[in-house]
Design a protein with these regions (language model features):
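Helix-start (N-cap) detector for alpha-helical repeat units in TPR-like alpha-solenoids
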Residues: 50-51, 84-85, 89-90, 123-124, ...
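Structural marker of alpha-solenoid helical repeat scaffolds
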Residues: 45, 79-83, 118, 152, ...
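Alpha-helical protein-protein interaction modules
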Residues: 240, 250-258, 262, 388, ...
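Canonical tetratricopeptide repeat
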Residues: 55, 87-90, 94, 128, ...
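Position-specific recognition of the canonical hydrophobic site in helix A of tetratricopeptide repeat
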Residues: 61, 93, 100, 127, ...
Length: 532
């Protein structure tokens, strides 16, 4: 019975873990739990059951747990009978994928070579080895594998794509584009082929073409293929290029609601809340979608623009459609607090905590309400919970330090928190998110703050919010520099009016310069950024 159940679950999970949703699987999933229990029973009964090791390795790979996946596939390969060449080759292929995910490319290449020694015409192994050789810059060797694939199948999209990538990286853009066109023409209605081509276009610095391909993929399947996620990722590298591409395609197809949704999301992710709001308005007015996420996102933008009455109406609509969403209640609390309704804010945040009590943003929201109520001890208690929930998040320490310093008048405790921020590793890919410059400034370590500024500006990708952070850092000891960096933040589209003009719960604030005429002049100059 157990064996039959394992086979049944394994068959389902093979499809599940090789689908586009594989990396979203979690151990909380009932099917995954059942599968893992069966695998454990099978291995307890037979510790050398290579097929079970292989199946569980594939499951761990699907969950993104590469360490456990590697351990299991090592055991599978160890116990696989050498006469079962096809299955053993599959095991080497899986281990190569795991090793590639871990960045161990040379070991992955060794496994792909082993798979091809067992089965010389293994198509997936040829494709994977070609891709890996391309990644390693061994283009001549990669070309051999792709041509081998093409001889086996003259309609192999993988071969055309691989050869196009080789040509792109060896200075043959015209030939690369021709090969890409051949690949797409084999299945012009398949959105995934446009995702693949967009990646190669991006590698060729052809961002308009890359964006157009992703937009077309969205139009084919409303973004289910992952095109939306790729557009959002591309926007972090080439924001203007992605927005220009979306603008161009919206002009061509003004009734494509999903394009407005994507553009609104990207505007919001880059703190241009007024532009994002315009797209959410279009979606609602044109009745493109009636999702609760639309009303949540519109409420979020409205709240950042301090239009609290409208924001409240929208977030309540979202809650009507999804009444157990912790973030929706947290945002309602933020809106009520921003509008001065602390009792209503407290009621909303209590409801948020019912659904997600250890959520950092909810803990911070509770702390801010307590701060506004003058209950600084309670505020610190809430910030303590935020620190416990996410000990590597610097903002929680800064909020707690600020409350210690100005609420409790405990400079010693505040300094301890500022120094704690300096000790954090900073796991975010964006350098500015470590907020160390602000901690240096609060500790009056001016030279170190200036060094952080230089490191941030040299980090390769300075976001509009990074200029805002620098404005906050200098607000306490160099007004001219603070104003200059605020100007740069606004010039680059930083449109969070609430954070610029209202927020006062931590040193990540412009409170020290808000009384200045230069500050008021800047807000007037960029008033369109705030929809004013």
């Amino acid at each position: 019975m157990v064996s039959r159940l394992r086979c049944f679950i394994g068959g389902i999970l093979f499809c599940f873990f090789t689908s586009s949703f594989a990396l979203h699987a979690t151990e909380n999933d009932d099917l995954v739990k059942a599968m893992m229990e069966v695998y454990a029973e099978e291995l307890a009964a037979n510790p050398q059951d290579y097929r079970t090791y292989y199946s569980r390795a594939m499951a761990y790979f699907g969950q993104g747990d590469m360490k456990k996946a590697l351990s299991d596939i090592d055991n599978a390969i160890k116990y696989f009978p050498r006469k079962e060449k096809d299955d053993l080759a599959q095991a080497y292929l899986l281990r190569a994928k795991i090793l590639s995910e871990r960045g161990e490319t040379k070991s992955a290449l060794t496994d792909l070579n082993s798979a091809l020694r067992l089965v010389p015409n293994h198509r997936l192994a040829l494709k994977d080895r070609g891709d890996l050789l391309c990644q390693l810059g061994q283009y001549d060797m990669a070309k051999i594998d792709y041509n081998h694939l093409l001889r086996m199948d003259t309609r192999s999209q993988s071969a055309f794509m691989g050869l196009a990538r080789v040509e792109a990286h060896t200075g043959q853009p015209v030939r690369a584009k021709d090969l890409l066109a051949q690949a797409v023409n084999l299945s012009p209605k398949d959105p995934k082929i446009y995702l693949e081509r967009s990646e190669i276009y991006k590698e060729m610095d052809m961002m308009p073409e890359a964006v157009d391909d992703l937009v077309y993929a969205v139009s084919l399947d409303d973004g289910h293929s992952g095109a939306i996620q790729k557009l959002v990722a591309y926007s972090n590298e080439s924001y203007n290029g992605v927005i220009e591409g979306l603008n161009r395609n919206i002009e061509r197809s003004p009734r494509q609601g999903m394009l407005y949704y994507v553009r609104a999301t990207i505007y919001k992710d880059h703190y241009d809340y007024a532009s994002s709001l315009r797209d959410w308005n279009t979606i609602v007015e044109e009745n493109f979608f009636n999702f609760h996420t639309v009303y949540y996102n519109r409420a979020f933008c409205l709240s950042r623009l301090t239009r609290f009455d409208e924001a409240r109406a929208d977030i309540k609509r979202a809650i009507e459609k999804d009444s157990q969403n912790a973030e929706y209640y947290r945002l309602l609390s933020e809106i009520e607090r921003g509008d001065g309704n602390l009792a209503a804010a407290e009621q909303a945040v209590r409801q948020a905590a019912v659904y997600d009590p250890s959520n950092v943003a909810i803990c911070l929201e509770r702390g801010m309400i307590a701060y506004d109520e003058g209950d600084f001890g309670q505020a610190i208690s809430c910030y303590n919970e935020a620190v416990i929930a996410a000990p590597d998040e610097p903002y929680s320490y800064l909020a707690r330090a600020y409350t210690q310093e100005y609420g409790m008048e405990n400079r010693i405790a505040a300094e301890a928190d500022y120094r704690k921020v300096l000790s954090l590793d900073g796991t975010s890919a964006a350098y500015g998110n470590n907020l160390k410059g602000i901690a240096f400034a609060r500790l009056h370590l001016k030279k170190q703050a200036e060094e952080w500024e230089r490191s941030l500006l040299a980090s390769g990708s300075v976001r509009n919010i990074d200029y805002f952070y620098l404005a906050c850092m200098y607000a306490g000891f160099d007004v001219d520099k603070s104003i200059s960096y605020l100007d740069k933040a606004l010039q680059n589209g930083y449109g969070d009016y609430y954070r610029i003009h209202v927020d006062c719960y931590s040193p990540v604030s412009l409170l020290p310069i808000r009384h200045l005429s230069q500050y008021s002049d800047l807000l007037y100059k960029y008033r369109a950024l705030f929809g004013k």
